[in-house]
Design a protein with these regions (language model features):
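A conserved active-site cap/scaffold subdomain adjacent to cofactor or substrate pockets
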Residues: 238-310
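Short phosphate-binding/catalytic loops that engage adenosine nucleotides
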Residues: 25, 132, 266, 330, ...
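Nucleotide/pyrophosphate-binding catalytic subdomain
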Residues: 1-253, 258, 417
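A conserved regulatory-domain signal marking ACT and ACT-like small-molecule sensing domains
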Residues: 279-434
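Flexible loop/turn segments at secondary-structure boundaries
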Residues: 8, 37-38, 144, 181-183, ...
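Structured core elements
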Residues: 7, 28-29, 173-175, 186-191, ...
Length: 434
């Protein structure tokens, strides 16, 4: 079970979370930092990078006072108020110990990690005060990344099992999301996917019956509710469908979180702490055949077109183009080819200028900025006649720069101008879901 920053954002919401995790099952619970805390810790780090010690200490004291207020509200006994005040004080002393003139990214990572330390200690102590059989598990004892900054799956599995074996008879285990050790043994974080990724990795490592991701939204919706009215939650998604939606813009879940659960074949449920009886969305390896599930949009896309007569009947041309993107570690979202041209889209403009300069060796390069990918997701196997034509018909009045279909049985994507995004989402909703 994973609960995000909003779900543990106030003492009352922490109490609500406790009601959900004390359900009679043996639960491993992953918690994010309280909402707003990570931003405050980053602000403290910014002051220290600028060598503004006074500004950093002012922010530290202000944040600690805020937590002292949370403690007074959360606990009912003097014993646990005093115990948690002591623990929280030690965490803030750790933050202050990083406040020095030779401040580096190492100290920043230590500071940012304290948000999860605060939330997990507070919830664990509240559970103890309420008489529950609970154990706090330090994530730094089993979460680690390798030399490529990817999760070390073998290490995580082995060490999570070792730590859990030390406390075999507990009903609830609490641990931190997001944070880990890197290959050098330094405090670090998972970077992509955050606490959701931690929950998925741990669920796969221990063979959980299911992985629950609790947020303030009742599952994945069939369209973006910020732009389309009357969207509805999708009751079930295949792992690939969920990954496609997450990659192409569904903010409720990061695409990296799907992979560990999919490999271990463990269902993922997206649930709402504000409405815990809502069914949410279940993600599994089951496909609902011949059904379109949802639409998502990915913003800030750049389209690149290369036209070259040298490409005609030439082998190795695409390989050389791809090598440019590999060199600059830039992923391609969509690609279409013809006899004399290739078009592709990217969303990372970090190395756009050097990429374009190198691509000009191959032909005439044209760039369209401010584009958007609209992704339609479902069981879109090519043998299922008609679905692609329905999606295309919905966009008949909108200029389409590129279409990608066939790379996946679960996705058809349209590249359009960002200015047409809302109109496209609404039209697709009208055609597909009404």
């Amino acid at each position: 079970m994973k609960f995000g920053g909003t779900s543990v954002g106030t003492p009352q919401r922490m109490k609500d979370v406790v009601k959900l995790i004390t359900d009679g099952e043996q639960n491993l619970v992953v918690l994010s930092a309280m909402s707003g805390t990570t931003n405050s810790l980053i602000e403290i780090s910014d002051y220290l990078y600028k060598q503004n010690l006074e500004g950093a200490l002012t922010c530290i004291n202000k944040l600690q006072d805020k937590y002292l207020g949370h403690i007074a509200e959360l606990y009912s006994t003097d014993e646990y108020k005093a115990l948690t005040t002591k623990v929280v004080g030690e965490i803030f002393d750790r933050i202050r110990s990083c406040a020095k003139t030779d401040f580096t990214s190492r100290e920043e990572r230590i500071i940012v990690a304290q948000g999860e330390m605060l939330s997990t200690n507070m919830v664990t102590n509240y559970l103890l005060e309420q008489g529950h059989n609970v154990q706090l598990l330090p994530a730094l004892e089993f979460m680690r990344t390798n030399a490529d900054k990817e999760p070390d799956l073998k290490y995580i599995k082995e060490h999570a099992e070792l730590v859990l074996a030390q406390y075999p008879n507990k009903d609830i285990y609490i641990t931190q999301g997001f944070i880990c050790l890197n290959v050098d043994g330094e405090v670090d974080n998972l970077q992509r996917g955050g606490s959701d990724y931690t929950a998925s990795l741990l669920g796969a490592a221990i063979g959980a019956s299911e992985i629950q991701i609790w947020t303030d939204i009742d599952g994945m919706h069939n369209n973006d509710p910020r732009f389309v009215e009357n969207t509805t939650p999708v009751s079930h998604l295949h792992f690939v469908e969920a990954a496609e939606l997450a990659y192409f813009g569904a903010k409720i879940l990061h695409p990296t979180c799907i992979q560990p659960a999919q490999y271990a074949n463990i269902p993922v449920r997206l649930l709402n702490t504000m409405d815990p009886i809502a069914p949410g969305t279940t993600i599994s390896n089951i496909t609902e055949h011949r059904k379109i599930k949802a639409v998502a949009a990915k913003d800030n896309i750049i389209a690149i077109n290369i036209t070259s007569t040298r490409m005609l009947l030439a082998y190795g041309f695409l390989r050389r183009v791809f090598e440019v993107f590999e060199k600059y570690k830039t992923s391609i979202d969509m690609i279409c080819t013809s006899e004399v041209g290739v078009s592709m889209s990217i969303d990372d403009r970090t190395n756009l200028i050097p990429i374009l300069n190198e691509l000009k060796k191959f032909g005439v390069v044209e760039v369209d900025d401010n584009m958007c990918i609209i992704c339609v997701v479902g069981d879109l196997d090519w043998r299922n006649v008609g679905f692609e034509s329905i999606a295309a018909q919905a966009l008949k009045d909108i200029p389409v720069r590129m279409i990608s279909y066939g790379g996946s049985n679960h996705n058809i994507s349209f590249l359009i101008s960002a200015s047409d995004k809302q109109r496209a989402l609404r039209s697709l909703s009208d055609y597909l879901f009404k």
